[in-house]
Amino acid sequence: MNAYPATKTLSEEIEHPASEAGRCGPDVRSDLRVRIERREHGGIEIELHSRVEPYYGESIRRLADTVLEELGIRHARVHIEDEGALPFVISARLEAAVRRAGLGKGTRVLPEQVELPEASARDRMRRSRLYVPGSEPKYFINAALYGADGVILDLEDSVHPSEKDAARLLVRNALRTVDFLACERMVRINQLPLGLEDLDEIVPECPDLILIPKVEIPDQVMAVEKRIAEVKSEYGLTRPIWLMSILESALGIENAFAIARASEKIVALTIGLEDYTADLGVVKTSTGTESLYARQQVLNAAHAAGIQAIDSVFGDVGDLDALRAWATNSRGLGFEGMGCLHPTQIPIIHQAFAPTANEIERARKILAAYNEAQEKGLAVVSLGSKMIDPPVVNRALKLMARAQAMGVVQ
């Protein structure tokens, strides 16, 4: 009898740990969980659980086969628990699972790209920007239907640290495949240096604007601008990508003007009040007295630099009356828009930032008086008992242009 045990084959000796990505469960929609167990032989074996399997099971399997093949996976057991995920989500989750296994590096599995919208104008209207968690694909598809001026696919605070890598791929694929209608397509990257890795995946898909969080010094803006330029050069892209810096600390506020002038690509400054008040060690209130200095610093720096000043989000999504008061005050201070955490906030913000009937009527009278004086060759323009100087005329022109852009007047 042979005293030596049988020799195991190489494939029997090697064990590969499983890798996962995505979510499933009764409260999950438009997502899936993927579990991949690599093996040395046997091809691709897919076990699929889905409520829509009778209708889309074969197409899901074909897509999984294609994605895995492009990523170089030839032999694996793949377990998919689907909760109604769209193809771009399925592809992103599979790619994330493969990358978490340490494979597929350098390979980007890209879904078919929809036609890019017209490039965003530097001075376009930015009254509202709706934040959408980058790890929650269920919010992507309908995000544009609520009428915000911009949709922010967020990779920062709304994404758990363990999901940053997977969210990056979801957002990348969403930029390629989701029609965001007339919304400006924005992405909030992570705080540097992690945010630079976000740009490597995001920039090739041509977002309109990148929000840079927790900016404290101009060098951070310049680092983002440099990485964007490098990626655009690598992919031969010429489409503009604008920047919006978020100031969220006492240091950032004190450096507001230098940050606003750090790059020609910056179109707006905004403020993050949750982090700012935490930095001060004070409680954020609905009146905002504790942050008035910071907001005015942002306003003054933005206007001095010739860019837009955008206010923070209003955190209490259930108190619409308080939101209305905040937004009205925000416009009165000189802000041109603010952030939104929930779609119900959008119409209230738009209403607050729209010129009122009285403002429009007064602007018309000012412009009429100015035009009449010009026709008569008069150097002095007056309306009633008040003199009208060039700044007043310019303000009236801007108000009427804004009213026309908002559809308030023809």
Language model regions located:
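N-terminal intrinsically disordered, cationic/polar leader segments
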Residues: 1-121
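Expand to "…catalyze enediolate/carbanion chemistry for C-C bond making/breaking, isomerization
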Residues: 91-96, 100-410
